């Protein structure tokens, strides 16, 4: 899976790469799946469903990510890419995530990814995934970015999560003196 590495530019005003550039990179690298360029939203607040309350930085990051995903799938179609496009969703809560998910599916996505989850509680992540899953068809794949809740996987049974990623095992390999090798 090719990913644009949004955590590496989380403090930047905008991503340093375009969808056109990242599509070319994914194609040249031979990835089977490619992720749209996103801009991580680090905060959640259900009251922001009232757009008058949503801080401009939050709305601009989520809207950038949404528009980027729509552009990404259009460019993928135009370029007849060989990889599976994954549209990223950044949100401020379960309802906004579900709304963006419906729109991406409506634009032709068969695979979506939920980003910006790392810093949220397991119950909050569950609420987001559950709401998204309830609003999209069962055959649409869901990827969870930065999902390091390996001890909580069982709680997510029944939500039909296709995939997840985490750098936690890699970080643990370098930082833990005892539990640093898995076989």
Task: List the predicted regions and their residue ranges.
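Non-catalytic, usually N-terminal nucleic-acid engagement modules in DNA/RNA processing proteins
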Residues: 1-77
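Glycine-rich phosphate/ribose-binding loops and adjacent secondary-structure elements
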Residues: 79-183
């Amino acid at each position: 899976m090719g990913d644009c590495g949004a955590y590496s530019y989380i403090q930047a005003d905008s991503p340093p790469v375009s969808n056109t550039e990242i599509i070319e990179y994914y194609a040249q690298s031979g990835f089977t799946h490619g992720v749209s360029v996103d801009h991580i939203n680090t905060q959640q607040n259900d009251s922001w469903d009232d757009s008058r309350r949503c801080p401009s930085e939050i709305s601009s990051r989520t809207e950038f990510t949404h528009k980027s995903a729509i552009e990404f799938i259009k460019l993928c179609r135009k370029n007849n890419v060989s990889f599976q496009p994954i549209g990223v969703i950044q949100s401020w809560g379960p309802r906004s995530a579900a709304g963006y998910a419906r729109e991406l599916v409506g634009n032709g996505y068969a695979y979506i990814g939920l980003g910006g989850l790392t810093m949220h509680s397991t119950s909050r992540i569950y609420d987001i995934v559950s709401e998204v899953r309830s609003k999209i068809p069962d055959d649409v794949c869901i990827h969870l970015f930065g999902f390091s809740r390996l001890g909580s996987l069982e709680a997510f049974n029944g939500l039909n999560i296709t995939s997840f990623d985490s750098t936690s095992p890699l970080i643990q390999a370098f930082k833990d003196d005892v539990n640093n090798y898995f076989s």
